[in-house]
């Protein structure tokens, strides 16, 4: 489905593909099964099942799909007009956020769908599209605004955290922030394990002290405080769901 404003929903199923692509509007490329490889500004992004990559209209990518089975994907394009409208509605001073979202300042990155508002929306859209539920124009117009709300909500948090990193070189700033996000995702995925700092920073090219310092500056909490808070949140959800204290204890 697509409209005259450059909003679109597309599904794909390919075993092999190689080519260049210019992102249309604000685009999320979600991998339903398999994996896709993106090369953007000299950096490689491997997008696995349950993950998506996010870019704006200035993003140029080389894409490669090469699998034994079909790689199934969902692509959602949102026009800059809608992103502007939603950002202006939710933020009284949206200029800096919009500049981050819609210019070459934007942080292209991959995200695990289970951890974001947009990821939840993409899962739901894939379910509905697979069931043939997206044929009504009004429904799709409302859907694009809803997706834009998810993007703006997620990226407003990213922008706030990213802005706390004070480095003059944009490449350095972006690289360090991606490493911090990757480390945080590792923590989220291993909350029930005995996590060690060496494991968390295994792919980060920095010392333990430098990592702790940057993590706390960016996310306000130290790595230990972050893990503790997430474990307490998880325990609370389990208790509310009927689990007993013994089952819930880490």
Question: How would you describe each model-predicted region?
Answer:
Residues 1-102, 127-138:
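N-terminal regulatory/effector-sensing and dimerization cores
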Residues 153-156, 165-177, 182-233, 240-243, ...:
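Basic/polar phosphate-binding segments, predominantly the helix-turn-helix DNA-binding elements
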Residues 5-6, 14, 29, 105, ...:
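A short alpha-helix capping/helix-coil boundary motif
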Residues 85, 103-168, 175-178, 182-185:
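An amphipathic alpha-helical interaction segment
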Residues 17, 39, 65, 72, ...:
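Generic anion/oxyanion-binding catalytic loop in active/binding sites
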